[in-house]
């Protein structure tokens, strides 16, 4: 079984180095490692050239983009390139995700044991930066419920006590996708920039085959803890807009109309309770809802990296 790796990086060279090392140390080696460099300015480009020049049994591929396309644009480019490469499964991850050394070995054994099953993807346990605490927010089950609601509950700690459990929503942290399924539906929504690109993609993949979480596959996610008091920043726009766009694309209109009321209400409550610069938060949420109704995606002309209420 041939496994490829797609990593997207932007200005986190120290973490990228750790990530690359974690793939090269796998007990079952990947066929290739493809790194999408989202126009980093911290020496990433130069380091990757040096990394590539040190030849190993693993093929090393670099895709340097001429602008920062966000995580969604980076994963789109990476997965698009993976379709032309020699692998059967593609592992996707951010540059701050470090799989344990036996992650690919466990994945390979599971896939070979269940080769008669219709699998779209498998994924593992995401651990917080302490290496022991499970971050349940990376796996979820999405379904419709009463009163035209869309429920998207995260996985629960008890789920990880099982040998496996089925989901239909994953993050691009510690996920391995069946390449055959990648060819049967659109790739990542590249115009999302950040947030919900992985959820939207995984939900479509779940319509083509099972998505299974295998807790013994473990990935440490070296991501900082976000304080609720920091909710009012540029990323909030994309979280609200893309949540609604995902619903608009994948569910009936009645659900979209209901969620255009429910989703902004929940976020406005969060801004009211925890956020600073509340008026900017409310305005950003309203702008996100308006654009979702128009089907407008892409990088917003105001809410983009570097924006803050005080600028």
Task: Identify what each model region corresponds to.
Residues 142-168:
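Short, flexible, basic/aromatic active-site loop/helix in glycosyltransferases
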Residues 234-242, 254-311:
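Non-catalytic, C-terminal membrane-associated alpha-helical segments of glycosyltransferases
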Residues 169-177, 181-187, 191-217:
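A short, conserved alpha-helix in the catalytic core of glycosyltransferases
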Residues 21-31:
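Short, acidic, metal-binding catalytic loop of nucleotide-sugar glycosyltransferases
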Residues 87-96:
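Short beta-strand-to-loop acidic/aromatic patch adjacent to the donor-nucleotide binding site
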Residues 22, 37-46, 67, 97:
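A conserved acidic beta->alpha catalytic loop
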Residues 102-137:
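Conserved donor NDP-sugar-binding/catalytic core segment of glycosyltransferases
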Residues 64-85:
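Glycine-rich, basic loop-to-helix element that forms the pyrophosphate-binding segment
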